[in-house]
A protein has these predicted regions:
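Terminal substrate-recognition subdomain of acyl/acetyltransferases
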Residues: 1-13, 103, 160, 167-181
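A short beta-loop-alpha structural element at the N-terminal edge
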Residues: 15-27
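Helix-loop element at the rim of GNAT/NAT acetyltransferase active sites that forms part
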Residues: 30-47
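Acetyl-CoA-dependent GNAT
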Residues: 48-108, 119, 180-181
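Short glycine/proline-centered loop/turn elements that form peptide/ligand docking sites
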Residues: 115, 119, 141-145, 162-168
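Conserved GNAT acetyl-CoA-binding A-motif
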Residues: 119, 126-137
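Conserved catalytic-core motifs of GNAT/GCN5-like acyltransferases
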Residues: 135-138, 150, 155-172
Length: 181
């Protein structure tokens, strides 16, 4: 699956949204470390990453060759500033219609339209891959993300009041959302 689109950010600068390639592994890992240190709303902490550049390159190669999964990066100002992905929930017949979606954006680029553009890109890719349902999990306190997802058509289908346990703020409620494609 391939994706490439140039967008104009709200600050007037441009960003290229495209497939992550194996050669992007170092930049993607750096972006992961930065984004996951900037907010408590993401699933993992930077020190929990088990990937090195070689393993990340293999992961990105598998995504680049996949017909139904994708890893998209946003490149602006000469660096990777955001990532997003669509992943199959499972390969068994009863699960093949479902995909998961996630996005992370560097704090310096929040509010510029990257989250919206990457969400739209992932929805488009999920449709093209033949999925019938796109799902995500979001921390209930992440009101900006929830508003973005609702605007894109996602609806809440469940909550887990102790879904995440943050090192700094204790338990966090998570919301499960889905979009019928």
């Amino acid at each position: 699956m391939t994706y490439s689109r140039q967008i104009v950010l709200k600050n007037g600068n441009t960003a290229l949204l495209r497939n992550a390639e194996p050669s992007d592994a170092g930049a993607v890992l750096e972006n992961f470390s930065l984004t996951h240190a900037e907010t408590d709303y993401l699933l993992t902490y930077p020190d929990e990453s088990t990937f090195d550049a070689e393993r990340e390159a293999r992961f990105l190669q598998r995504k680049a060759e996949s017909a139904n999964e994708i890893e998209i990066i946003a490149v602006a100002d000469g660096r990777v500033v955001a990532t997003a992905g669509v992943d199959a929930v499972g390969t068994r017949d009863k699960l093949r219609h479902r995909a998961e979606f996630g996005v992370s954006v560097l704090r310096a680029y929040w509010g510029l339209g990257l989250g919206r553009a990457l969400t739209e890109a992932c929805i488009q890719c999920a449709k093209e891959a033949g999925y019938e349902q796109l799902e995500l999990t979001v921390v209930a306190e992440n009101e900006r993300a929830i508003a973005l997802y609702r605007k894109a058509g996602f609806v809440e289908f469940g909550r887990n009041p102790r879904g995440f346990r943050s090192r700094t703020s204790g338990y966090q409620e998570i919301i499960h959302m889905l979009l019928a494609l």
